[in-house]
Amino acid sequence: LIMQELEKQFHIHCVEGDVGRYVILPGDPGRCESIAALFDDAHHVAQNREYNIYTGTLLGEKVSVCSTGIGGPSASIAMEELHNIGADTFIRTGTCGGIDLNVQSGDIVVATGAIRFEHTSMEYAPIEYPAVANLDITVALRQAALAMGKTTHTGVVQCKDAFYGQHSPAKMPVSYELLQKWEAWKRLGVKASEMESAALFVVADALKCRCGSCFHVIWNQEREAAGLDQKMSEDTSSAVRVAVDALKLIIEQDRAAKK
């Protein structure tokens, strides 16, 4: 018992054997139970702070889901501690806000890379280092989304630390910087904005892990500003199913490659 307590990860309260090699990472602890319901033989493992963990199987392979909370700091903690006890393949699934005018509410965005407009990743790699998703996972996510018939956008997402820095930039003392950079993201064709992928991609590279991300588009403030059709879409079940189906593809690929 004493040894088990010593080995327990500080934040996620898990020990080696509690989680699988493959982990889905939502932000919201409240989504973990419904994600675990898509596994076989799922059971609850632990919950502490923003971290809610379930483990089950997919295609006979041990898999887990662990929520990360909001933003890079808590997401990086989850990845670090999960990696400490054996995880090496991660899929972030969650929500985003569209930026590119072609990205509409209810669509799926698969991130190929992320703008490091956050600071967690700075403690892992210099700013010149890109935050890039694992190619195999990215391809699997896109394949899974298209197989579901979802309108799918693949490209770069923007990651920030301050939610209201995006949504209320004019009131911020550094509004001049926020607004100018937002205009740059638009002109560069950035697909959407969210808060975790840049940190997760860089941390995964530092740990020699694999990570990809897919998102459900809730809203696109740029479409609203342009007077285009726009509605709120809060049902994230499609993005969750995309992540689970993609994980099955990765498991099959790993078996074929004997990874």
Per-range role (PLM):
Residues 2-140:
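Metabolite-binding pocket within alpha/beta catalytic cores that recognizes anionic/polar moieties
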Residues 29, 97, 158-164, 199, ...:
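Glycine-rich beta-alpha junction loops
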Residues 42-47, 149-156, 252-259:
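Flexible, glycine/charged-enriched surface loops at secondary-structure junctions
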Residues 88-89, 191, 210:
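Short acidic/polar active-site loop segments enriched in Thr and Asp
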Residues 131-189:
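Active-site rim beta-loop-alpha module in soluble metabolic enzymes
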Residues 140-148, 203, 242-253:
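Generic non-transmembrane alpha-helical segments
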Residues 198-232:
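Zn-dependent metallopeptidase/amidohydrolase metal-coordination segment
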